[in-house]
Amino acid sequence: MRKLARNLGVTAPALYRHFESKEQVLHEVVREAYERFARHLYTALEGQTPLERFELAGEGYLGFALAHPRLFEVLFAAPDHLGWDTVPRDLEAQACALGQFWNDRVRECMDAGILRKGSPEDTAMTLWSHAHGLVTLFLRGRLRVDVEGFRQIYRDSHRRLLAGLATAEHGEQLSEDAAGPRTTRNDGGFVPSDHLYRTGT
């Protein structure tokens, strides 16, 4: 707690007036992270159609990760990395609510005939894993692109995956909406998509 207090620029006694232990501080950090994450995701409800709401949810996911990369890492860290045997129940409930929100976006796209019928939970897991993998690669410096270049990769790749899960009526349009295989590099030039991955350490 003393080290944490120094990093925050306050005294240890001042910190103890608000938190009993560093475990309680961590709990509060994760709780706040979930609330910020939720605010980003729930802007999707402003969408006018199931597809708009689904895509806005994806944008909210990306927006949170780019705005709060450290909190993003904390939210998806293994419990033992945070010093927990299990996730506290209130935090688990927050995580489940966000997972259900994502499932609901997929379910309403299925009901609207945009995505092929199937298990909303399984399809949501596929789409989430794709989004999370791309974001994690970028945040860890494994993609040779700037932020705007990554936004393009994220959106185009998302559309390609979505097209493969869509009904025949919507799949072709989603495929056409995805951009070409070139994106902006950090130096402002272009690099073929098959050379985006940074293999060096």
Q: Which role does the model predict for each range below?
A:
Residues 1-24, 28:
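Helix-turn-helix
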Residues 7, 24-44, 52, 56-63, ...:
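Alpha-helical structural segments
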Residues 19, 64, 71-72:
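Conserved hydrophobic/aromatic "anchor" residues
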Residues 36-47, 130-137:
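Solvent-exposed, amphipathic alpha-helical segments
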Residues 71, 80-81:
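Hydrophobic, amphipathic alpha-helical faces that serve as interaction scaffolds
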Residues 84-92, 110-157, 168-182, 190-196, ...:
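Hydrophobic/aromatic-rich alpha-helical bundle segments in the mid-to-C-terminal region
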Residues 105, 160-168:
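C-terminal alpha-helix
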